[in-house]
Amino acid sequence: MPPRTAAERGGRRKSVKAPPPVDPLVELTTLESVHDALAKAERLRNYFQVERDKVNDFWTITKGEVETYRNRLFNAEASIEELERSHQVEMKVYKQRVRHLIYERKKKAQACQDESDRLLREAEDRHLQRMNEIQAKLQQQDQQLRAAAADHEMNVYEKRDSHSYMVTVTKTQSHEKELARLQVSCEAKLKVLRDELELRRRAEIHEIEERKNEHINALIKQHEEKFHEMKTYYNQITTNNLEIIHSLKEEIAQMKQNDEHNETLMYDIDRENQNLVAPLEEAQREVAELQQKRKQNEQNKRGLEVTRVKLRSLREEIRRQREEHQALEERYACVHREREELKGKFESALRQAVMVVEERNEVLQQKLIESHALVEERDVQLEGVLRAMNLEPKTLELIATEVDEWLQRKNQLIKDLHFELKKGEKLYSATLLEMERRCQTANIASLPRSNFE
């Protein structure tokens, strides 16, 4: 590009207009107002910057506190859920333990009752046996006493006869005195013998009565000892049950105390949340969620109360089930008899149905075999006849048409027989399925299908 000439530069200067004159005072005033506005804008900017930093810091601190409280609340809810689960597990354990203790108590009580009844029966049998032996001994002694008395009377009678004979023969005073003396001595001996036997009989009767009384006292003492042992055992069971109930009450009181502490903690958390800044919508939503979870916690507490009520109802149900046990056993025996009767009837009916189905299947199979044999025989005969006749083509076609129609009828008959066979098989399968269903309904073990094949 060539340099411009002086004329061009002069023309340029002439074309530019001169600026208007400026008042220095006005310009100075404008400049001061601009500086004031700039300073004010800087102060406002600094103020808003500081306020923004404060709001950000407050937002960060508040968010951290909300997160901390949220974590605390989650921890509290987790601990409450863990306590609830442990409480449910303990309740199940205690229920199982109570059932086990009730079963053991019932079993041991039945065993003690059976043992006491057995011991009592054995003692009664031994007592009756002993009394029978004593009675037999008394009867034997009475018989011996009567036999001895009879022998003694016989001896006395014989001696009396001999003495009478001697008296009649001798008729002397000495013999009479001797007879008197002998009579007196015999009577004395007889009296002594009677007294001795009577004393011995009384002593033996007294000894037998003493042994009987001692045996009765021993049985009474043994029965009292067994009764005292049973009483001590049941008292110990009752004491153990009371201790378990006391421990359960203490655990419930501890859980109530924990619930009160959790409620206090929830109240403090709620109060601290209410003191937070309200404009934060997300924080308000989180607080609403926390309140909803607190309501859920209260519902869990009410569920705990319902569980306690259920525990009491379960205890009542245990007592009621004890009363229903005997009735259920009787019903079970009746149902068992009916089940055996129904089982016998159903098995007999099923065997009859299986026999009928098997007979029909055999008949259909025999008919099918006979039809196939007949068709093959007719085919052979037809081929032989056609070869022997040497007929014309039209005649052969007519004969072939008639044979085809006859074969179609036979094929239709075969299809019908196959259909009847399939129908019988389906009926057989349906019968087996109905048998299994009714066996399951009546709680009867169904017979395997291999028994019907």
From Swiss-Prot:
InterPro entries assigned to the protein according to its UniProt record, in alphabetical order: GAS8, GAS8_dom
Chain intervals with Basic and acidic residues compositional bias: 1-10
Main subcellular localisation: cytoplasm
A cellular component annotation (GO) from this entry: microtubule
MF annotations from Gene Ontology: microtubule binding; small GTPase binding
Record has Cytoplasm as a keyword: yes
GO biological process: one example: cilium-dependent cell motility
Top-level division of the source organism's lineage: Eukaryota
Region feature Disordered, mapped onto this chain: 1-22
Disulfide bonding pattern of the chain: none
Coiled coil: 60-156, 185-377
Keywords tagged on the record: Cell projection, Cilium, Coiled coil, Cytoplasm, Cytoskeleton, Flagellum, Microtubule
Additional remark text: Procyclic parasite mutants lacking trypanin exhibit a motility defect indicative of abnormal dynein regulation, but have an actively beating flagellum and are able to spin and tumble in place. However, bloodstream form mutants lacking trypanin exhibit a severe growth defect and are not viable. They revealed a failure of cytokinesis.
Protein role: Cytoskeletal linker that plays a central role in the flagellum cell motility. Required for directional cell motility. Plays a role as part of a dynein regulatory system that regulates flagellar beat in response to signals from the central pair apparatus and radial spokes in procyclic cells. Also plays an essential role in the bloodstream form of the trypanosomes as its silencing is lethal for the circulating form.
Protein name: Trypanin
Lineage, highest ranks first: Eukaryota, Discoba, Euglenozoa, Kinetoplastea, Metakinetoplastina
